[in-house]
């Protein structure tokens, strides 16, 4: 039953399989929360979001107290700005490992994933901005015979 495709114009007419056409269902628990995990460098963020007033709690503290630098707060709020849902979700998260920059990136990744579980229609906008992709860059390991990962010990000819 395979259709023969002779040109790119014919490719548009071919219907996608039924499994790909199905609408994704939102994943929410009994309290109406969506859960996701985000990672960046050595940091791991566990994120729960639910409809609310825009309150963000990190490790039991307010966002402004945990991340004093405005740049890091901006990074965390980017998924809400892209999806036009600022002040519509309450976020509760726990972050472990890494430094503040890695933790902010992990939070952004986790919030983006949780938003797509809450409302699958947000996925294309978040994916276009690159928020759904786990950043693979990590610290390069130190090598023996060298001072650091790439820095060599000082060399003297004589």
Swiss-Prot record:
Gene3D superfamilies: 3.30.230.10. Keywords: Ribonucleoprotein, Ribosomal protein. The keyword Ribonucleoprotein applies. SUPFAM superfamilies: Ribosomal protein S5 domain 2-like (SSF54211). One of its GO terms (molecular function) is RNA binding. Residues 16-37 are annotated as: Disordered. One of its GO terms (biological process) is translation. It comes from the Bacteria. Pfam families: Ribosomal_S9 (PF00380). Belongs to the universal ribosomal protein uS9 family. NCBIfam families: PRK00132.1 (NF001099). This is Small ribosomal subunit protein uS9.
């Amino acid at each position: 039953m395979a259709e023969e495709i002779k040109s790119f114009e014919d490719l548009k007419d071919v219907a996608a399989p039924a499994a790909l056409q199905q609408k994704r269902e939102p994943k929410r628990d009994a309290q109406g929360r969506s859960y996701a995990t985000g990672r960046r460098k050595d940091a791991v963020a566990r994120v729960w979001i639910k409809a609310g007033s825009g309150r963000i709690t990190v490790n039991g503290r307010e966002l402004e107290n945990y991340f004093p630098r405005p740049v890091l707060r901006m990074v965390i709020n980017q998924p809400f700005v892209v999806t036009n849902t600022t002040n519509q979700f309450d976020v509760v998260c726990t972050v472990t490992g890494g430094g503040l920059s890695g933790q902010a990136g992990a939070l952004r990744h986790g919030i983006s994933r949780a938003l797509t579980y809450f409302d699958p229609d947000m996925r294309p906008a978040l994916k276009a901005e690159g928020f759904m992709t786990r950043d693979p860059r990590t610290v390069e390991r130190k090598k023996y015979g060298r001072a650091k990962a790439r820095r060599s010990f000082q060399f003297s000819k004589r």
